[in-house]
């Protein structure tokens, strides 16, 4: 299964509380921090909500 590298590009400060919570639960602590997550529907849903804050790269296994 493919994986996604998600990088926080903009700060979550001054965003909606729901968006700040999603960023924190995703494991993104600071700007330019990255996490690798599986490419599934739940991950894609969070990325859709945070599209203006993150960049996504696909990693092939």
From Swiss-Prot:
GO cellular component: large ribosomal subunit
Disulfide bond positions: none
Listed GO MF terms: structural constituent of ribosome
Top-level taxon: Bacteria
InterPro entries: Ribo_uL30_ferredoxin-like_sf (IPR036919), Ribosomal_uL30_bac-type (IPR005996), Ribosomal_uL30_ferredoxin-like (IPR016082)
Subunit structure: Part of the 50S ribosomal subunit.
Family of the protein in this entry: Belongs to the universal ribosomal protein uL30 family.
Name this protein carries in UniProt: Large ribosomal subunit protein uL30
Top-level taxonomy: Bacteria, Bacillati, Bacillota, Bacilli, Lactobacillales
This protein's encoding gene: rpmD
């Amino acid at each position: 299964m493919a994986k996604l590298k998600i990088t926080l590009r903009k700060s979550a400060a001054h965003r909606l509380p729901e968006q700040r919570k999603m960023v924190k639960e995703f494991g993104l602590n600071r700007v330019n921090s990255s996490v690798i997550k599986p490419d599934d529907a739940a991950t894609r849903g969070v990325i859709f909500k945070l599209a203006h804050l993150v960049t996504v790269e696909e990693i092939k296994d």
